[in-house]
Amino acid sequence: MKPGIHPSYGPVVFRDKAADFAFLTRSTMTSDRTVAWEDGNTYPVVDVEISSASHPFYTGTARVLDTAGRVERFERRYGRGGAR
C-alpha cells in the first residue's frame, strides 16, 4: 500500500441512541468524543440514529403495506386506463 494516502483505521464504538445499544468495531470514522468500554479502554464514540438494534426490519416490527388494495382502489377511482 502507498504510505500517507489511506485514512487511519482503528477501533470505534458506535452507539445507537434510539435502542440504547453500543458495539465496538473497527472503522475509519473518528470523533472528538470518547467513551470507556467494557474492557477498560477508552475509544472514540460515534452516535448513530438507527442500527440493527432499532431498525424495524431487524427487530421484526416491520409493517407490510397493502399494495394490492392500493392498486385496486386506484383502478376503481380512475378506471383501467387504456392506450389513448
From Swiss-Prot:
Disulfide bonds: none annotated. The lineage of its organism: Bacteria, Bacillati, Actinomycetota, Actinomycetes, Kitasatosporales. The keyword Ribonucleoprotein applies. It comes from the Bacteria. Belongs to the bacterial ribosomal protein bL31 family. Type B subfamily. GO terms for molecular function: structural constituent of ribosome. The gene is rpmE2. One of its GO terms (cellular component) is ribonucleoprotein complex. The keyword NAD does not apply. GO terms for biological process: translation. This is Large ribosomal subunit protein bL31B. Part of the 50S ribosomal subunit. Keywords: Ribonucleoprotein, Ribosomal protein.
